[in-house]
UniProtKB/Swiss-Prot annotation:
Organism: Wolbachia sp. subsp. Drosophila simulans (strain wRi)
Official protein name in the record: Ubiquinone/menaquinone biosynthesis C-methyltransferase UbiE
Keywords, comma-separated and alphabetical: Menaquinone biosynthesis, Methyltransferase, S-adenosyl-L-methionine, Transferase, Ubiquinone biosynthesis
Biological processes, Gene Ontology terms: aerobic respiration; menaquinone biosynthetic process; methylation
Annotated pathway: Quinol/quinone metabolism; menaquinone biosynthesis; menaquinol from 1,4-dihydroxy-2-naphthoate: step 2/2; Cofactor biosynthesis; ubiquinone biosynthesis
Gene this protein is translated from: ubiE
Molecular-function annotations in GO: 2-methoxy-6-polyprenyl-1,4-benzoquinol methyltransferase activity; demethylmenaquinone methyltransferase activity
Broadest EC class assigned to this enzyme: transferase
């Protein structure tokens, strides 16, 4: 299996999400059997958002996390940031349909955020960190824009490592054969979903990603597995 070259990743990611934006939520439901909704609920419910807090949701184009945050804490001021304008447009439409009209929507790269130092109380990112070209830059930027004692909350798929050979083969079959086939049928785009599966396989283990978060300066970093380690929630404090 070939790896994704860093120098080509930004353009590839843009093309992938340009292609799947209109059917992104539908595909998430189909591929995860609806579980992505529960994972996102747990992510938001794991954090106590203080009143009038400023939250930056990175790679948050679909608005899923932002909408959940303001439902939990209506006074929160949420900025949704995504590198892909098509995803932001879809998220803005979804937010309006959910009667959430007070978000700020910013098209920007997670590796070069257009915000001041120490501007936000919380920085969230769900299923986005594996798509950045340079994780260290993105993590450094998250650390920079957070206030002292601010929280970094990251939800991401994890590479699966099972001792059970049969389960491993079934998981690989579903990931590399079934998911791209579903993408071909539902989203008319097989190659984009081949990329998404490959990006999960190339992501570091939960323990290794924890170390990456710590290396940029976050303290008290911990992670919690969900659904037997299919996804993991990492939380750190500036």
């Amino acid at each position: 299996m070939s790896t994704i070259k860093i120098e080509k990743k930004s353009q590839l990611v843009k093309e992938v999400f340009d292609s799947v934006a209109s059917r992104y939520d539908t595909m998430n439901d189909i591929m995860s059997l609806g579980m992505h909704r529960l994972w996102k609920d747990r992510m938001v419910n794991s954090v106590h958002f203080t009143k009038n807090s400023k939250v930056l949701d990175v790679a948050g184009g679909t608005g899923d996390i932002a909408i959940r945050i303001v439902r939990k804490e209506p006074s929160a001021k949420v900025t949704v940031c995504d590198i892909n304008q098509n995803m932001l447009s879809r998220g803005r439409d979804k937010a309006i349909n959910s009667n959430q009209i007070n978000f700020d929507w910013v098209c920007a790269n997670a590796e070069s955020l257009p915000f001041e130092d120490s501007e936000f109380d919380y920085c969230t990112i769900a299923f986005g960190i594996r798509n950045v070209s340079d994780r260290k830059k993105a993590l450094n930027e998250a650390h920079r824009v957070l206030k002292p004692h601010g929280k970094f909350i990251c939800l991401e798929f994890a590479p699966m490592h099972y001792q059970n050979e049969i389960f491993t083969k079934l998981y690989d079959l579903y990931s590399f054969k079934v998911i791209p086939k579903i993408g071909s049928i539902v989203a008319k785009d097989k190659s984009s979903y081949e990329y998404l599966v490959k990006s999960i396989r190339e992501f570091p283990t939960q323990a290794d990603f924890k170390m990456e978060i710590e290396e940029v300066g976050f303290k008290n970093v911990e992670f919690h597995n969900m659904s037997y380690g299919i996804v993991a929630l990492h939380i750190g404090t500036k």
